[in-house]
Amino acid sequence: MNAQFDDATKTLDTLGLRCPEPVMLVRKTIRNMAQGETLLVIADDPATVRDIPGFCRFMEHDLLQQETQATPYRYLIRKKEGQL
């Protein structure tokens, strides 16, 4: 495993869930996190390859790292400073 993924503040397992559930859970989880904390998202829905980066751009969170070559996909998101 990658050290950066290992250091995530929280982990969200969305394996088996399909669009739009993974992104909805990411949004709900990030709302309850402190600014600057990181979230590791584990997913197997192919739509997350598009949806999670799009969510991060729209909400201005930092997508620090992603692994999408094979399932399970992994995304590391940092809650943007100044976001409530």
Swiss-Prot record:
Catalytic center residues: C19 (cysteine persulfide intermediate)
InterPro entries, A to Z: Sulphur_carrier_TusA, TusA-like, TusA-like_sf
GO cellular component, as recorded: cytoplasm
Name of one Pfam family that matches: TusA
GO function term, MF aspect, one: sulfur carrier activity
GO terms under biological process: tRNA wobble position uridine thiolation
Compartments, record wording: Cytoplasm
Keyword hit for tRNA processing: yes
Keyword terms, alphabetized: Cytoplasm, tRNA processing
Xref: Gene3D superfamilies: TusA-like domain
Principal location class: cytoplasm
PROSITE patterns found in the cross-reference section: UPF0033
Pathway assignment: tRNA modification
Family: Belongs to the sulfur carrier protein TusA family.
Known function: Sulfur carrier protein involved in sulfur trafficking in the cell. Part of a sulfur-relay system required for 2-thiolation during synthesis of 2-thiouridine of the modified wobble base 5-methylaminomethyl-2-thiouridine (mnm(5)s(2)U) in tRNA. Interacts with IscS and stimulates its cysteine desulfurase activity. Accepts an activated sulfur from IscS, which is then transferred to TusD, and thus determines the direction of sulfur flow from IscS to 2-thiouridine formation. Also appears to be involved in sulfur transfer for the biosynthesis of molybdopterin.
Quaternary structure and partners: Interacts with IscS.
Name of the featured protein: Sulfur carrier protein TusA
Organism: Proteus mirabilis (strain HI4320)
